[in-house]
Each structure stands twice: as structure tokens, then as C-alpha cells.
């Protein structure tokens, strides 16, 4: 766990211990109730590479049965400390700050994982992640369907997002609908900062995150969206993610992912 300008031997030792235990066999079994895992990370943080690797492991686990939808959100508050993360955005720093306020944290830190918007922990802790998954897999979710994913222009992606009807069991407030575009895989040669001289690898790197509407109780949500891609983006290596989240970044009550894979 790292906060900029704060680095202690105790924090380093804790990060090292959880990384040693990252190879533990997950305790959760196959589940068809998907969960959303958000990793707040930075290429400028030396404690983050183990968390990046753990997120990649969860992404691979998702393809073998347990439905884990991962997002890597690179914050920008490390950018003045030796290395500017090319995938960072203040959008993700703001999102992390909102979680800190709602979850009662005194400050933000990296690496941090947030599961289904409600459980946060040091992002390199496999044990904490497995405990969070065991709780999250049992929570009910609203099915989300992604379809008609097409590239209408070289830099414009279009998709149809639809949910099943929202029931009273999910509370009285109308959940918000988010859509994200993420790179399947990304790598960087870091020349400066805490990770200087290393080649870092990332999974599901978010490049676009938008709130596109809300779902009213007793109703379905259905909408076509158009998303602008960054210049030079290869759509064959993108994934589209949609999720429902209770207002003010509350509990995630639905999530789906679909490979863009324009072959």
C-alpha cells in the first residue's frame, strides 16, 4: 500500500508478504454471479506491479468459470514523482477519492482494489480478494446484455446495452449505468521513478469510463451508445464493460463484459 511521499518499511513488508501469498489457491468455487473488481494503480508506484499481476490472474480465472470482471484504473497523483503514467487520468483519481469518502477512508492509496463498490483492500492481497469474492458472489445481480458491437468508423465503437427489469429488492434509488472501454493488455518500459528500468504489464486498462443513464424501478434499460476510441487503437484488443451501480458509487448490482474482437 503506498501513499505518495510516504514509504515505510512496515508497508513494504506487508506488500511483500501478500505478494508471496498471491499464489494461494483461490477458495471460491465456480460462480455465475459476476463481480466487478476495480484496481487503482500507477506505474509510478513500486508497490503496484504485484497488484497488476494479481488482477491479471483474476482475469484468467474469469475465463475458467468464476465470473470476475476486472478494471485497471490508473490514477494521476503519482505523475509528478518521477514518471508520468501514460494510462493515467484524473477521472480515475476522482473515482478513487469518491470511494474513499463513501467507505470512510482518511486518504487514498495504491494499489487498492474495490470489489462490487463495497469492499476495499490492499490490491496485492490475494487473501483479502478471495474473502471479498466469497461475499460478493452471493449477492444478487441484475443481468446485463451487450450486443451489436460494431466499429462504425475507425475511431467510433457502437454497442447496444440492455438490462433486465429492476426489482424492489435492489433498493429505492435508481442505479446508474456505466460503460467502459479497456485495453485487453498493455505494457510500458518505465525509464524513471520508483519502477525505473522495469517493463510493466497491465490487464483491462480503462481508457474510457462514462455514466450513460440510470434504471428506473420496474423497468428495463436499453440504449445504443457510441464511444470514441483513441487514435491508433486496435479494436481487436479491446473489451467493453457495462455495470450498474447504486448512486454515489454505491454497490455494484450488475456487470457484464464482452470482447470487441473486430476480426
Task: Identify the meaning behind each predicted range.
Residues 1-9:
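Bacterial N-terminal signal peptides that target proteins for export
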Residues 17-109:
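Active-site-proximal cofactor/substrate-binding loop regions of enzyme domains
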Residues 8-11, 23:
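Histidine-/acidic- and/or cysteine-rich, low-complexity loops and terminal segments associated
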Residues 10, 14-18:
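Hydrophobic helical h-region of N-terminal Sec-dependent signal peptides
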Residues 4-5, 50, 230, 234:
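Serine/threonine-rich low-complexity intrinsically disordered regions
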Residues 84-112, 116-263:
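Short, conserved sequence motifs used for protein processing/export or organelle targeting and
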